[in-house]
Amino acid sequence: MTRMTKSSSSLFDHIYPYIVITVTITIVFHNSLDCDFTFDDTSAIVQNRHVHTNETDWFRIFDVDYWGTPIRSEHSHKSYRPFTSLTFRWNHLWSPALNPYEFHLTNVLLHIIVSFICFEFLRIMLGPQNRWPACLFTLYFAIHPIKSEAVTSIVGRAELLSTLFILISLFCYFKNAYINFAITVLLASYSKEQGMTTPAICIAIECLKLMIQFKSLNYLPFWSRLWHSLSNLTMAKIIALIAYTALLIGTRIYLAGSSLPIFTKFDNPASFEETPSRQLTYNYLLPLNVRLMLWPRWLCADWTMNSIPLVKTFDDSRNAWTAIFYLVFIILSSRAFYLATSKQSKRLFNIEIDIERSNLLISLILIVIPFIPASNLLFPVGFVLAERILYTPSIGFTTLLAIGWLRIQNYFQRSRFIQFLLNFSTILMLVTFTFRTYERNFDWHNDLTLFKSGLMVNPNNAKLYNNIGHYYERRGEWSEAIKYFRLAADKDQEDIGAELNVARSLIRLNRLKDAEDLLWAIKPRVRTSILKNRMVPQYLNIWINLAHLISMNQTRLHEAENLYQEVLTIRSDFVDAYINLGELYIRKRLFDQAQETYEKALQRARHIDDGKRADIHYNLAIAKSLKLDHQQQKPSGSKLGSLLTEIAQDLMIAIDINREHREAIINLAILLQRPQFPSNNQNEYRTFAINALRSYSRSNELESFQFNIAITLLDIGGPTNRMDAIHHFKRAAELKPDFRSALYNLALLYYDFKDYEQSLFYLNRTLEHYSNYTKALLLTADIYSRMERLDDTEKVS
């Protein structure tokens, strides 16, 4: 009995930290399950057709960035996270209606798993005897308020997954499971770019081993010590890690088209400053990140634009915080190096490192290396501060605090008051964090609550006003949208985007004159901005918006054409200009010019978005079709067949690119019904059309699609296809009970099968809605005659 009790107690001691972690995270983050898709979730999931399982093939995710833009496009932010996007696709597979609940639940579960692994890591770093402190500081990691963005924002899954795989890969590496290490590093890198820092963490620890080995050979001459240190397995590991890192980075650069993303001064103002302002501001951001970890009172989803004033001179008082940060960092680093490289005896995994003396240095490595890519110190990034990017470095920060906590506890182990104070203050901190994180999750309930909470922290951030304006814009509340767009323009006079938003909303309110005057007023400023800064592709939309507005007046089409031509002189590969110019030519019945414009778009525009490429091929098919219909001398025979085939191929390309392109699908089905369509490979085209119609109908069931499937099946012919056609005609009639063509075709088919009762049933349904429909009346009379129901025949006649 005693043995069983001890065994049960031991088991409970082993699992209780996991129970505590799970219950705590569930309590703190359960309100995140009720949140909507917010902020970047919209572009990464809701509007990203590559996440929607019914629209594209899964492998297309590897061709696009996190937001669904082709990775090589200049419009791409170059955030390449295909594995994270695949998990969104899996969520969509489970919840085709795009219910955010499943997405949020997945994030919370992933956070629990990461916290479990963090607990195991802390147990190693603090020593297996310190389970309580390890559990305590795992809770610090798990419920810290900055985790709200990574967990409650669905796109924060990139941080969750990359951190998960980084930790697993470190365990694999130190267990000598190098193949598993390589695989998990790849998964970490394809979850988020910071995963590529994992080999660098291992390199830093291997370098620590080299230093220890070098010092242990102090009885040898310097060059002999150096040779012995470098000519061993440790050095081979470092070389292999460097090679693997180079391969990862090289592949990543190749996939991105060997170009960096284009950011504006509104994304990261310091990037556009001269020396020393740029460097002073970048370095000032370092203590601000530490402040977020130590005092997470002021949290905001967006710190861009004027949220943090630039540090322009050396006499700015904020430089004192930078100096304090570097002073503390140097002291900690010096102490860490001293402890790690002296009196080594124990082993970390299979590495001859005293974990008790090296844990301080390892914690600093885990803070610094994963943070470097987001620090602006190597290259500019598209944000100033971002709470989510601290998710991985916070493991190192948590370890650092836990080490300090243990040192204080051990130093004052005889003082009950200090011990009580230490435990009480720690628990108080965790309780405070619990309430703050729970409160912060409510900010992420929807876009409006999120951005309004941001204005409480950063009232000078014009982007937040713009985002609130977009929220009201999506709801059709145009006046309220204009109010916030104008507030954004007032906060930053250089923010041309806000004024473009105002103009767009004015158009929606039918205040066309006001919108046109505003667009003409800001057009010269856009040209100046293009000359001063790197070109912002979105600003070119002023020409599109202005031309579109002018083209509403049929007498001003020439002005609109000139605007499209003007913007193409600025950017000869501007796809939107080609698309709109082609549509303008179609309106002017200049079908040759329209065709030429669309062909030029396909030739000149690089890395076109899939949706736009599909639209161009569709528009090209329409231009060719209209050109054919309006020719005075219509071609005949093989020439006509060749032109119809060419049109069909353009439509098929559009459908191949975008399986949800409704217009292309329906026009292809109609085109194939033309009697002039060549018989060569006709069934192949019709089979393609049927598959496209069925694929679309699975998610967007429309009576017109069911009808066209049936007609195309009849064109292919054969008893099986005719029976299948009946099914689709019936479905069309169910979706639209007064669908005359579907009802009449059903009657015809049953007439052909000599099933006169069924034929009469559908004829009667047709005549209920269309009592004077001649064809139905004649067919009814014919059936009555065949059935020798002469009285009924006379009534119909």
What kind of feature is each model-predicted range?
Residues 2-527, 531-541, 545-547, 580:
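Polytopic membrane enzymes that build or remodel cell-surface glycoconjugates and lipids
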Residues 2-7, 11, 448-797:
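C-terminal luminal/periplasmic domains and tails of membrane-associated envelope-modifying transferases
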